[in-house]
């Protein structure tokens, strides 16, 4: 379970940042 001190918006924000970083890294690997 997620901590009750973490708002759902914060989790969504971190998830979006993680997805963005993951996509950028994948693009770098694909471009090599």
Curated annotation (Swiss-Prot):
Chief site of localization: secreted
Subcellular location: Secreted
Swiss-Prot/TrEMBL GO biological process terms: lipid transport
Region: Disordered, residue numbers: 1-32
UniProt biased composition (Polar residues): 20-32
Keyword Magnesium assigned: no
Origin: domain of life: Eukaryota
GO CC annotation, single: extracellular region
Keywords assigned by UniProt, alphabetized: Lipid transport, Secreted, Transport
Tissue: Hemolymph.
Subunit structure: Equilibrium between a soluble monomer and a bound lipoprotein form. Apolipophorin-3 associates with lipophorin during lipid loading until each particle contains 9 or 14 molecules of apolipophorin-3.
Family as reported in the entry's similarity comment: Belongs to the insect apolipophorin-3 family.
Function: Assists in the loading of diacylglycerol, generated from triacylglycerol stores in the fat body through the action of adipokinetic hormone, into lipophorin, the hemolymph lipoprotein. It increases the lipid carrying capacity of lipophorin by covering the expanding hydrophobic surface resulting from diacylglycerol uptake. It thus plays a critical role in the transport of lipids during flight in several species of insects.
Name listed for the protein in its UniProt record: Apolipophorin-3
Organism: Diatraea grandiosella
């Amino acid at each position: 379970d997620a901590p009750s001190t973490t708002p759902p918006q914060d989790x969504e924000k971190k998830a979006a940042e993680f997805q963005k970083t993951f996509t950028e890294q994948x693009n770098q690997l694909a471009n090599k």
